[in-house]
Amino acid sequence: MNITSEELLKEARALEPQLQQWRRTLHRHPEVGFDLPHTKELVKKALTEMGYEPKDCGKAGVIALAGGKKPGKTILLRADMDALPIPEDSGEEFSSEVPGKMHGCGHDMHTAMLLGAAKLLKAHEDELEGTVKLEFQPAEEIFQGSPDMIAGGLLEDPHVDAAVMFHVLAGMPLPVGTVLVPGGGITMASCEQYHIVVKGKGGHGSTPENCIDPITAAAHIHIALQEINSRELKPGDFGVLTTGRFEAGAASNVIPDVAQMWGTIRTTDPENKTGELIRTRMTEIAQGVAAAYRCTAEVSFADYCPCMVVDKPLAENAMDYMTELLGKGAMDMTALTGGKPGGGSEDFAFVSHKVPTVSMFIAAGGPEQGCCYGQHHPKVRFDDSILYEGSAAFGWFALRWLYDNAGIAF
């Protein structure tokens, strides 16, 4: 391999103006779920101009191939593209121009980083000892994009042997650009959506005796569900049950017929037995409490996303490669987490259950940079000075891993 880590980092830094332009254009025009026409257009146009032949994958994904001129393995590099359905209040000069939508998780950063990596890899395509598959994924926030692209053939033609993703972190008191590398095993929780519909009998607020109040029942259900963690799970078992949305009625003087709540269940049990227990008890508790208040309760679950599983040998590769590229800018994530999985979830986990995978994080600004809020907050900011490091990290990982797996001494 003729390129060194220092040279690749220098080439990536030269891309900063373009990286920032891509990121800020995407940030101004956020799109959510699978409905990403403008985002896809930007990605495909940029890839085509670099010399790639981008292809659609699944409902709204884009893939492209680099290398393939030499026999060897295939490594997948992934960036998610979708935004969140929340209003932006960051104060950035390039804030969202779309009411009620915002890139509040940094997926605009990821997309720009992978486009930068695509440019670097195209420039060094003759040095790739195998193939790099670039994945631009929709619908991560609803945990549907990854399984959809897998069903669309993401991991085949050519078959993927390893997979890599990076996620930016905002609001963390870490040096900007620090890459956090996990130690292997389960690193992120599973997640599942739940929906509870409590049905009663509506009427005038002045005559509750003639009604069956679903709000009272739903409120008691919500409180009772919080006892599952403390009374039903073994000490040490990780389980988080959160109700994030509660709706009932439309007028202050009317008892409604229906009250509803939506939320999530998160566990770190790879076999999901903890999740099964929580689901069973949720249903029993909701229906039992509802009956005590003369109501009925319907409980449903959807959009299950498994735990993220990081391949230990690949994580060891990652630590070596990121140290080569960034020196002390690479950090063992277990120093922060104690080796315990995080409670967040990521739908790239579907890939991690099929091929060896590593998911890393990049510190994208903390309080010193004015990035005082974390992901999914309307005021969150990301320091896009780290974009070139993300591009270089993607590119260097691919180059080095293909070399290592071609049996060539570095």
Name these PLM-found stretches.
Residues 84, 91-102, 109, 121-256, ...:
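Histidine/acidic-residue-rich, glycine-tolerant segments that coordinate divalent metal ions
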Residues 26, 64, 77, 107, ...:
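Divalent metal-coordination and catalytic microenvironments
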Residues 2, 6-9, 13-20, 33, ...:
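Electropositive phosphate-/nucleotide-binding environments in soluble metabolic enzymes
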Residues 219-410:
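Metal-dependent amide/peptide-bond hydrolase catalytic core
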